UniProtKB/Swiss-Prot annotation:
SUPFAM superfamilies, per database record: Actin-like ATPase domain, Heat shock protein 70kD (HSP70), C-terminal subdomain, Heat shock protein 70kD (HSP70), peptide-binding domain
Record carries keyword ATP-binding: yes
PANTHER family assigned to the protein according to its UniProt record, in alphabetical order: HEAT SHOCK PROTEIN 70KDA
Keyword terms: ATP-binding, Chaperone, Nucleotide-binding, Phosphoprotein, Stress response
Pfam families with a match to the protein in the record: HSP70
Keyword tRNA-binding: no
UniProt-recorded name of the protein: Chaperone protein DnaK
Induction: By stress conditions e.g. heat shock.
Gene it is expressed from: dnaK
UniProt feature, compositional bias: Low complexity: 608-619
First and last residue of the signal peptide: none
Length: 642
């Protein structure tokens, strides 16, 4: 059985790990880095760039470079969070036919799972290169506060990338796994504060040794799926744009390329301010108007930046309070506070966490890698390699159905340990009603419309009867991925209807299949492109070396031979401009054959030179030896025999 890898599919950065010989290992990507920017670029020639190469070209290709796709995954176009992002993102977000938020790049309409699949594919490839074998299975992490649609969409992304997603687990839980197994510090209750690039989660987790088994039980979880490092960057961008407009009278928000440069600079400045008290944002030629080019140079102090994001940090504290209350634990019960996510490197965030929990957060957990490591550990548990770990996670939000009067009746309460199932019997609202619509909801509000609609289905052929008489049993079943399966059964007839919630939005099976095929076709295209580039590089290298050799030794071969080489060179130079791999390889071979005579002459000359040099060295060595002769007398020493 192959390895099950662990992938932290992040908003800003992603990471992949695997357990080898019982130890988790974070795998470096093709560029040699342990984390990969979750950035995807669609370039003009059809190539798709992922990670650092995509980030490098973002300034010149802002409309076709997608970042933070995770903020859109499993979301409706009408969601207020999506509407907010439409104004901030340089790329186009549009409403898909199913009502979801999709992205438009180069006349293609792409679903967020399709875009995220490109990042997952890069993670998969990194793992395959490291392990030297094909990888087909993965554990992928999601924010604990992701709803059902977002979890399902993440699973779809895995499928499109060619991965069987063995389990979706919550990021704070994964971080707790990494921490608990690395430290082995006995029974404890920990708080995991996870402030990533686009999402915030907090989980209260109990770690216990039960009969030699490490048990990780999530007591509660809370969070905000639209609060993260990207929002901190945006505050800094907004401030710089406002100040620049005051000074120069130019609105940088109207210049997409300038905004992209500013985004990169703001992210860099934010990171610098975690270790320095002041930094400078310096962007020459940021834009221009009728008076000429404009340069941006602005000093930002740590205190100023902290004042810009003060309310964002405060927003993360309320979920901590709720999580503690839901877990039924007090601050004094918390042994350790673990920080996860790159944004937790900000000193002000650390201070706020310390102030709330009353203790110094642990600094011995890598905030960028802990989640992927935990996912890899869970992968080793699922593959049977590790048998001493038990993970008990929870559903983050309550689940129920809409009932008479537009209210939500909860069947499963938030923070219930999963997998779990619950059922309740309902009846009809009208006389002689022959069908009921089961409208599935997720959330905490009493009013049905105020909660997240996960989907609906019908149960028909109910025998006519007065209202309140038919007995319809609705069963909710949440699997270990936190994904919901719902069934409804008429107790009188035994007739049943059921669905795996794909949300009223989400991708259909046919769409996923199409995207899987597209991805496979892309992989084939990528392979062909790689082969073409390799052939072209080989041919260009050959052309260069033969031109050089012809210049140095061309006078040593006959005119016919020289003309033959020059003709082959010309043909090869012409063909490398095209995209025909076979033609390039053929002309390179012809050139190599045509220049054989030249090669022989060069080889013979090199041998002659080496021989001459060797002879000279020997003669020189002989002379040196003559001058170093030492006269000595030898005396035989006889040992006395016993």
């Amino acid at each position: 059985m192959g390895k099950i890898i662990g992938i932290d599919l992040g908003t800003t950065n992603s990471c992949v790990a695997v357990v080898e010989g019982g130890n988790p290992k974070v795998i470096e990507n093709a560029e040699g880095n342990r984390t990969t920017p979750s950035i995807i670029a669609y370039v003009e020639d059809g190539e798709i760039l992922v990670g650092a190469p995509a980030k490098r070209q973002a300034v010149t290709n802002p409309k076709n470079t997608i970042y933070a796709a995770k903020r859109l995954i499993g979301r409706r176009f009408e969601d207020k969070e999506v509407q907010k992002d439409i104004d901030l993102m340089p790329f186009e977000i549009l409403k898909a036919k199913n009502g979801d938020a999709w992205v438009k790049v180069r006349d293609q309409e792409l679903a967020p799972p399709q875009i995220s699949a490109e990042v997952l594919r890069k993670m998969k490839k990194a793992a395959e290169d490291y392990l030297g074998e094909e990888v087909t299975e993965a554990v992928i992490t999601v924010p604990a506060y992701f709803n059902d649609s977002q979890r399902q969409a993440t699973k779809d992304a895995g499928r499109i990338a060619g991965l069987e997603v063995k389990r979706i687990i919550n990021e704070p839980t994964a971080a707790a796994l990494a921490f608990g197994l690395a430290k082995q510090e006995g029974d404890r209750k920990i708080a995991v504060y996870d402030l990533g690039g686009g999402t915030f989660d907090v989980s209260i987790i109990e770690i216990a040794d039960v009969d030699g088994e490490h048990q990780f039980e999530v007591l509660s979880t809370n969070g905000d799926t639209f609060l993260g490092g990207e929002d901190f960057d945006q505050r800094l961008i907004d401030y710089i744009v406002t100040e620049f407009k005051k000074e120069q009278g130019v609105d940088l928000k109207q210049d997409v390329m300038a905004l992209q440069r500013l985004k990169e600079a703001a992210e860099k400045a934010k990171i610098e301010l975690s270790s320095a008290t002041q930094t400078e944002v310096n962007l020459p030629y940021i834009t221009m108007d009728a008076t000429g080019p404009k340069h941006l140079a602005m000093k930002i102090t740590r205190a100023k930046f902290e004042s810009l994001v003060d309310d964002l940090i405060a927003r993360s504290i309320e979920p901590c309070r709720v999580a503690l209350k839901d877990a039924g634990v007090s601050l004094s019960d918390i042994t350790d506070v673990i920080l996860v996510g790159g944004q937790t490197r900000m000193p002000k965030v650390q201070d706020a966490v310390k102030e709330f929990f009353g203790k110094e957060p642990r600094k011995d957990v890598n905030p960028d890698e802990a989640v992927a490591v935990g996912a890899a550990i869970q992968g080793s548990v699922l593959s049977g390699d590790r048998k001493d770990v038990l993970l008990l996670d929870v559903t983050p939000l309550s689940l129920g159905i809409e009932t008479l009067g537009g209210v939500m009746t909860k069947l499963i309460q938030k923070n219930t340990t999963i997998p779990t199932k619950a059922s309740q019997t309902f009846s009809t609202a009208d006389d002689n009603q022959t069908a009921v619509t089961i409208h599935v909801l997720q959330g905490e509000r009493e009013k049905a419309a105020a909660n997240k609609s996960l989907g609906q289905f019908n149960l028909g052929d109910i025998p006519p009867a007065p209202r309140g008489i038919p007995q319809i049993e609705v069963e909710f079943n949440i699997d270990a991925n936190g994904i919901l399966h719902v069934s409804a059964k008429d107790k009188a007839t035994g007739k049943q209807a059921n669905i795996t919630i794909q949300a009223s939005s989400g991708l259909s099976e046919a769409e996923i299949e199409r995207m899987v095929k597209d991805a496979e076709a892309n992989a084939e295209e990528d392979k062909k492109l790689h082969e073409l580039v390799t052939a072209r590089n080989h041919a260009e290298g050959l052309i260069h070396s033969i031109k050089k050799s012809l210049g140095e030794h061309g006078d040593k071969i006959g005119a016919d031979e020289k003309a033959k080489i020059e003709s082959a060179l010309k043909e090869a130079e012409e063909v490398v401009k095209g995209d025909d791999k076979e033609a390039i390889e053929a002309k390179a071979e012809e050139l190599a054959k045509a220049s054989q005579k030249l090669g022989e002459i060069m080889y013979a000359q090199a041998q002659a030179e080496a021989g001459a040099q060797g002879g000279a060295e020997q003669a020189e060595a002989g002379k040196k030896d003559e001058g170093n002769v030492v006269d000595a007398e030898f005396e035989e020493v006889k040992k006395d025999k016993a």
